[in-house]
Design a protein with these regions (language model features):
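Pore-lining transmembrane helices
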Residues: 1-233
């Protein structure tokens, strides 16, 4: 088994899944949803319909972009990598709803977990048959969508519950909870994990979202001041 996993480049480790995959997911999120939101907002403020359309299309591709980025971080072969676009779309769409059908915030988190499993399953069967071009995409997509249908709504509900609890506590005690949220998100910014991905997965908005932004800004100002001697202007 160890020899098979090594040959398939399947490594079960916290670094690969919690750092490499999560960081790649954040990049995929930025290159789709976040940049799309920025462009769309510019279009709305400047009354440029083209930018609004561009932003809408970019935001709509957040699921596939995150899944493909995760597959790239896991060093998935081409057929697995391309198949993850479908998996990401399904996981993001189903993770954005709860079991009751209401809106959920677990799209990015669902994409992360499901894309990892689908990618590793695809890697396991890749180039094992003479009809690899059929088997590998089929396994990757079927496993991914099956897990998306099974897990994603629950992930969406759980992420929404956690995010809502944080936002409720922040509204109840804005000073102390604002400090806690800003410090924790700021610390996440300094670690090899993605603060943007965490906040997106929990759907933080309102005071909690503002506290997270303040924490990140404070950390970046601190980095700039501490490294000014080495980096200059």
């Amino acid at each position: 088994m160890k020899a098979f996993l090594k040959r398939k480049n399947i490594v079960f480790s916290a670094k690969r899944y919690g750092i490499d995959a999560l960081g790649a997911m954040a990049q995929g999120l930025f290159c789709s949803l976040l940049i799309g939101t920025i462009v769309k907002t510019l279009g709305q403020q400047l009354s440029i319909p083209f930018l609004v359309e561009v932003g809408g299309f970019a935001s709509a591709m957040s699921g596939p972009a995150m899944a493909v980025a995760i597959g790239y971080a896991l060093q998935a072969p081409p057929l697995v990598l391309f198949s993850l676009a479908t998996v990401g779309y399904a996981a993001n769409a189903l993770g954005s709803t709860t079991l009751s059908g209401s809106a959920g915030a677990g799209g990015p988190l669902a994409v992360l977990l499901i894309a990892i499993v689908a990618a590793e399953c695809g890697k396991a069967v890749s180039k094992e048959t003479k009809v690899d071009i059929i088997v590998t995409p089929s396994v990757t997509i079927c496993v991914g969508i099956l897990l998306a249908m099974w897990w994603a709504p629950s992930i969406g509900a759980a992420a929404s519950a956690v995010g809502n609890a944080i936002m409720w506590a922040t509204d109840l005690q804005p000073f102390f909870m604002g400090i806690a949220v800003s410090v924790l998100v700021g610390m996440a910014l300094t670690l090899p994990i993605s603060s943007a991905a965490i906040c997106a997965a929990l759907g933080l908005t309102g005071l909690a979202g503002g506290a997270a932004v303040a924490g990140c800004c404070a950390q970046m100002v601190g980095f700039a001041v501490m490294s000014f001697k080495e980096n200059k202007w």
